[in-house]
Amino acid sequence: MNIITPEWVKDAVFYQIFPDRFAKSERIPRKGLHLEAWDSAPTPYGFKGGDLLGVVEHMDYLQDLGITAIYLNPIFASASNHRYHTYDYYTVDPLLGGNEAFRELLSVAHTRNIRVVLDGVFNHASRGFWQFHHVLENGANSPYVDWFYFNRDRLNRKKHWGAYPTPEEQQAIDQGGNTFDVLGYSAWWDLPALPKLNTDTTAVREFLWDVAEYWIKFGIDGWRLDVPAEINDDSFWQEFHRRVKGANPEAYIVGEIWHEAQRWLQGDQFDAVMNYLVTGALLGFLMKDKLDEQMFHIGDYGKYLRPLDAPEFADRVDYLLGLYNPMVNKVQFNLLDSHDTPRFLTTAHHDQAALRLGWLFLFTYPGAPCIYYGDEIGLEGGPDPECRKSFPWDDAQWDHDLRNTLKKLIMLRKTNPALRQGSFHRMYASEGVYAFGRKLGDETLVVVINASNQARNLDVPGDGLGWSDGPLTTVFGEAKASVSRGQIKGLKLEPRSGVVLKK
């Protein structure tokens, strides 16, 4: 199959925003609302009051950083601060400013050539979702009874039941019971608040496809799909792809898949996935024996986390690049962390060198890099809810050196097309040092990362790069080197440092 992916994503720099925690605008009325203090520690259920107009009012900040695309965590009406419990798929949460605030955000972002991708939660809804609530009220008589997986015997007997478990029922679920047996319906991960949608039902399929198409026509630039593997039906996602691309052929479809994803990346379902496998490899290489796998209890992600030396990391990178078509690799959603993981700096035990090296790799590797809000100023946090802190807008609290490093890397990527669309060449992997080249036409760059705690003096084979003899230009980092007989000679790297060289 001929795989076609969105052109703009190949050049994109993403920034992930958790709307309740990024910024709040005085234009959103909050009189009488009970909100947690903005600078207080995050809690699982508390609201801080961030909104979409807050994002609008800080668009200058994003543009100054170099961001060209925003990925927003869910924004639809919901009773949770993360909004993965969808009440209404056609209404932006009033706490975020409603549909008009989102319309303004799209207008302002697009005027600045910044794309906007929404988080789509299509596997499950919520207890407050109208169709689910209708069944709770009417039982087997509800027209929506086929929208979910209900215990029909329980419905037909009209036994009184509800979606809010008693202490005894919750204890039964916590001890390994499932919501279908205990409460009478199936829920994602047996979380009572998340009734699973029955996507075998024609009406449900049409509803979700219409939602996807509606917001594309509204003006969004793509969908990030929450737990799409839970809808174990290729035909559902193939039609989703057809509807979305029919509304906008350049729309981006990226799935939250934590494992190998060839099934979905054949050109007829998703354009890309969140590249957690590369994240895991990078953590293993940069952290080695300091890697704390216990911080990553998310699905089967933990099994991919282990310390890696340079040759093992290089082999892993080669393997992961070989999984997918080059057109897919160019638009993979590459990240160091997200709302579902501890922040990278916390995982790295506050080792800023690890974060800088992680960014260096992220911004020189094939695919679209994404920064999780606040990482650029040194925001830290362990597993949820700690990784969802409010953004501190007092710049006295920022690490400006970190932010400047990121700005330089973003500019490096923007000004060197080979880093965005060039071919990838493994060049060196030994003693904690990994080097690779990116080549596009006459432009060639070499990235060298020293993840070890010792200075390294090395010569790097230049096989396949076709360089003539002479000095190299250092475009990032601090090092001097030259080419002699096709090899990079006399390269000296300080411990835990990296460099980008250009001929």
Regions found by a protein language model. Give the residues of each.
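Active-site clefts of carbohydrate-active enzymes
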Residues: 326-348
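Core domains of carbohydrate- and sulfate-ester-processing enzymes
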Residues: 133-190, 194, 284-285, 293-317
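The substrate-binding groove and active-site-proximal loops of carbohydrate-active enzymes
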Residues: 39-52, 85-98, 191-205, 221-231, ...
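N-terminal structural segment of carbohydrate-active enzymes
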Residues: 1-118, 123-125, 129-141, 146, ...
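Hydrophobic faces of well-ordered beta-strands that scaffold small-molecule active sites
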Residues: 13-15, 70-72, 116-118, 223, ...
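Active-site-proximal helices and loops of the catalytic beta/alpha 8
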Residues: 106-112, 123-124, 130-141, 210, ...
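Carbohydrate-interacting/catalytic domains
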Residues: 1-18, 22-24, 28-68, 103, ...
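Conserved, mostly hydrophobic/aromatic
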Residues: 17, 62, 72, 89, ...
